[in-house]
UniProtKB/Swiss-Prot annotation:
The lineage of its organism: Eukaryota, Viridiplantae, Streptophyta, Embryophyta, Tracheophyta. Exons 2 and 3 are cis-spliced, while a trans-splicing reaction is required to link exons 1 and 2. One of its GO terms (cellular component) is ribosome. One of its GO terms (biological process) is translation. The gene is rps12-A. This is Small ribosomal subunit protein uS12cz/uS12cy. It comes from Glycine max.
């Protein structure tokens, strides 16, 4: 417990909240260019080949972003829109690529949860 003299000398500092997606710089989304598209394996107990992309953002950051959905058309130099949101079983992946915008096409033949994958309504 500090004394009154100590509190006068230096006041209590408010707790600053640390952002979970610093590369977005406070924006809801950011545009970026893919520098590498590859797969990584999740941590235990899961097993898969998760599709990710290394993206250079307009904010100057180089980040790893997850590519959601089944199948994608992304390659090097593809321009993508990136949003926040981590992937729990992929350490270091704190961003998602938005499907159905810019160069990332929507998921084909998607019936449910279409808005999350940029899929058009089936005829």
């Amino acid at each position: 417990m500090p004394t009154m003299k100590q509190l006068i000398r230096n006041t209590r500092q408010p707790i600053r909240n640390v952002t979970k997606s610093p590369a977005l710089r406070g924006c809801p989304q950011r545009r970026g260019t893919c520098t590498r598209v590859y797969t990584i394996t999740p941590k235990k107990p899961n097993s898969a080949l998760r599709k990710v992309a290394r993206v250079r953002l307009t904010s100057g950051f180089e980040i790893t972003a997850y590519i959601p959905g089944i199948g994608h058309n992304l390659q090097e130099h593809s321009v993508v829109l990136v949003r926040g949101g981590r992937v729990k079983d992929l350490p270091g992946v704190r961003y998602h690529i938005v499907r159905g915008t810019l160069d990332a096409v929507g998921v084909k033949d998607r019936q449910q949860g279409r808005s999350k994958y940029g899929a058009k309504k089936p005829k």
